[in-house]
From Swiss-Prot:
GO molecular function, one term: NADPH binding
Binding site for 1-deoxy-D-xylulose 5-phosphate: K128, S154, E155, S184, H207, S220, N225, K226, E229
Record-listed E.C. numbers: 1.1.1.267
Organism of origin: Pseudomonas paraeruginosa (strain DSM 24068 / PA7) (Pseudomonas aeruginosa (strain PA7))
Protein name: 1-deoxy-D-xylulose 5-phosphate reductoisomerase
Gene: dxr
Pathway(s) it belongs to: Isoprenoid biosynthesis; isopentenyl diphosphate biosynthesis via DXP pathway; isopentenyl diphosphate from 1-deoxy-D-xylulose 5-phosphate: step 1/6
Length: 396
């Protein structure tokens, strides 16, 4: 019998990381944790190390590494604790690693995800910002290295399942008319427009269907999450923005659809549980038990659809514009959004200010070509600086 596949889980203490480790634990004959990384939830990371006994753990700073190393050694765990961004890249690209779950949220996850790609790993991509920021560079690296890139976002995983195996030959060539990217509409889908300025972080984080981290929950509430996913879909499936249509589907049962030229629409359905796309990507092209309950269509009862209202969700409009503009625009969109969402979560700005800040950054910063990672990161820094200036002027 072959040895278990070794997986590095980047962002192990987040919701995606925990779901990944749940699947790992269900299949000890198939998978084992090689490295687990965490950022701020270090007590949770220690507990995960005690349970999964990885070869490596990675934390942000040396002091935290020394403390965690001591705790694990006292418990008889031989995990070696590393620290810093370079260590993240090392555990993502180590020769012993078979697959990498890239689940660090935001721009911080880009270098390690790219390191896994350049090392030719099977990369389970949950960090959508990596593709949003550096789409062309990222996909070129995939082709150059021979990495296997499998999407973890439920929507992109659904699209991947609904496309033919040879979709890389070109969407038109395989008969695809358009990709239908579904969205729940978040907690504010029916909130009166005049009330959106006064919603709280707690309300924004109360997603009706999915359990997610705070930043992604706010992105879902503003539908920036769907805007980032639109950009990601364009890169993953070599689609034009005009070929990707966003559809609000409140039940979150249909995770996305592919519309073909013969009139067929193929969809992937399932309960809203990230273990489904995670297990599919881990085992692809096979399928394995994930722990997700079967979908009860009789309990679902009905499936509703509606067009997104761009007045209610201006972030979706801004993301589509950035996708159409290209160059550094998506990286700046993402950076401005990260700054704005953090400020909202800290109660420095209103929910409605998030889109205002992003639009201000996109209007003030010139779009440039991005031909290297340094240029991507420079665009990211410029956008963060401009967004910070807005906060100083209006929220200081």
């Amino acid at each position: 019998m072959s040895r278990p596949q070794r997986i590095s889980v980047l962002g192990a203490t987040g919701s995606i990381g925990l779901s990944t480790l749940d699947v790992v634990q269900r299949h000890p004959d198939r998978y084992e944790a090689f490295a687990l990384t965490g950022f701020s939830r270090l007590a949770e990371l220690e507990a995960l190390c005690l349970r999964h006994r990885p070869v490596y753990a990675v934390v942000p700073e040396q002091a935290a590494a020394i403390a965690l190393q001591g705790s694990l050694a006292a418990a008889g765990i031989r995990t070696r604790v590393l620290f810093g961004e370079q260590a993240l890249c090392e555990v993502a690209s180590a020769p012993e690693v078979d697959m990498v779950m890239a689940a660090i949220v935001g721009a911080a996850g880009l270098p390690s995800t790219l390191a896994a790609v350049e090392a030719g790993k099977r990369v389970l991509l949950a960090n959508k910002e990596a593709l949003v920021m550096s789409g062309a560079l990222f996909m070129q690296a995939v082709k150059r290295s021979g990495a296997v890139l499998l999407p973890i976002d439920s929507e992109h995983n659904a699209i991947f399942q609904s496309l033919p195996r040879n979709y890389a030959d070109g969407l038109e060539r395989v008969g695809v008319r358009r990709i239908l990217l579904t969205a729940s509409g978040g907690p504010f889908r029916e909130t009166p427009l005049e009330q959106l300025a006064s919603v709280t972080p707690e309300q924004a984080c109360a997603h009706p269907n999915w359990s997610m981290g705070r930043k992604i929950s706010v992105d879902s509430a503003s539908m920036m999450n769907k805007g980032l996913e639109l950009i990601e879909a364009c890169w993953l499936f070599d689609a034009q923005p005009s070929q990707v249509e966003v559809v609000i589907h409140p039940q979150s049962v249909i995770h996305s659809m592919v519309d073909y030229v013969d009139g067929s629409v193929i969809a992937q359905l399932g309960n809203p549980d990230m273990r489904t796309p995670i297990s599919y990507a881990m085992a692809w092209p096979e399928r394995i038990e994930s722990g997700v309950a079967p979908l009860d269509m009789f309990a679902v009862g009905r499936l509703d659809f509606q067009r997104p209202d761009e007045q209610r969700f201006p972030c979706l409009r801004l993301a589509r514009q950035a996708a159409e503009t290209g160059g550094s625009a998506p990286a700046m969109l993402n950076a401005a959004n990260e700054v704005a969402v953090a400020a909202f979560l800290e109660r420095h700005i209103r929910f409605s200010d998030i889109a205002v800040i992003i639009e201000d950054v996109l209007n003030r910063e010139a779009v440039t070509a991005v031909e290297s990672l340094d240029q991507v990161l420079a665009a990211d820094r410029r956008a963060r600086s401009v967004a910070g200036q807005w906060l100083t002027r209006y929220a200081g």
